[in-house]
Amino acid sequence: GLGVAVDASSRGYRVLLVEQHDFAKATSSRSTKLVHGGVRYLQQGDVSMVVEALHERGRLWRNAPHLVKDMRFIIGNYRWWERPFYTIGLCCYDLLAGRLGLGRSLPLSKKQTLKELPGLLHDHLRGGVVYHDGQFDDSRMAITLMQSAHDHGAICINYMKVTSLIKNDSGKICGAALEDTLEGGTYEVNVKGVVNATGVYVDDIMQMDKPESRKKVRPSQGVHIVVDAAFLGGNSALMIPKTRDGRVLFGVPWHGKAVLGTTDTPLNENSLEPKPLDEEIDFILDQAGQYLTRKPKRSDVLSVFAGLRPLAAPTHSDSKKTKEISRNHKIYVSDSGMLTITGGKWTTYRQMAEEAVNKVAALIGLEPRACVTRKMQLHGYREEVDRSVWDYVYGSDADQIAALIENDASLGELLHIGYTFRVAHVIWAVREEMAQTVEDVLARRVRALFMDARAAMEMAPRVAAIMAREMGKDKNWETEQVKNFTNLAKNYILA
């Protein structure tokens, strides 16, 4: 949805984006933090999807270098045939990326492998293979897209829910009824076209348009756990090419932590806060433990989170296997003229948006205008950033945050002794990033909830007080915000 807003507004179209909760509240903030082509899909022979994703990976790296970086991934080899097998396959992966590649895949000796990833299991290790993919911060990218859309004239509003669609006498959608979910106001807007890009909720909007609409999405739950970066021991990521359920498993350095995941559990229900299953958590700990010298335990988990992939439903709706559910995106157009886009992944968001805007513009008769996002610098663009401090995620906006602290030294105070989040980051989130709640700040503006849920709970009262002063809220609001966030954060902590 944010990608569509950026694409359409940068072409000069008038755009309104409404989000029922906060930007990236659900799936978009709960990824494996990768911008990648998908090695697993290459193994499955889905070459066209891999090529598209690799090219989009390169474009995203070029358009937002402050948020996307080259990450070295290590595959440890424990059998004689694995090093030549994976080296050949990953060299093909590199070739498919063409000029948008990030680096060459190479075989490694045992010594080189352990230098890259000291935490890798030493016993029976023969060597390894290194390949390159992208790593990013998902919700910070979402906020960057919101700001980029705004820079091009789009109106983006969070906590604004579509409650019904308005149609003209011909049955075509010409407007929508909206509800402010924080303040309770209701509104109506007139529109020429509607793009339904609501992730796992696309079916709800389609049924709002046409109650008998067949479901287009099959949710699949992916769980991740976050542990200390010492489990990996280096700056490179771990890739386990085949777990017992046939997936790959990643261990990715991220903001001084390590993200381990993911799972692939088909579900029939949607939730803004899906709950990780015990068996999913145990699966990740077990599989990671088979490849790491230090075996992660439940007591080592700093945060656990689950997200729902909006996979395009298979032709046979009774299929239970997520392997049969397409990772490609699909576009549907209803009789009323609403365009729905579903499937896909973070890496290909820009391509999905380009296709959606091309189609909706033709559908409603807008003047054809070329897409400009393939080589468009996103908000905050900065080529060189210091990734040792939190401020790098803001790109060029970090200078303005530094100016706040220069004008008032108290804004440089840390929110928590163990992290570099500062009072100024909360002020900035409220003034410039549309943060409305403590959760918005601690989950998606700074990533404390996903990095260390207990520490985030300790930050909540301070954040609530800062926001209350900035937003003119009373003590009751502060108390309610801390209570709500504490109840939420408990779901990110293992008992």
Where are these regions (language model features)?
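Gly/Ala-rich phosphate-binding loop of Rossmann-like dinucleotide-binding domains
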Residues: 5, 9-10, 148
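A conserved short coil-to-beta-strand element within the FAD-binding core of flavoproteins
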Residues: 158-174
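A structural signal for short hydrophobic beta-strand segments in well-ordered beta-sheet cores
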Residues: 162-165, 250-251, 331
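Dinucleotide-binding Rossmann-like beta1-alpha1 core, especially the glycine-rich loop
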Residues: 33-116, 249, 386-387
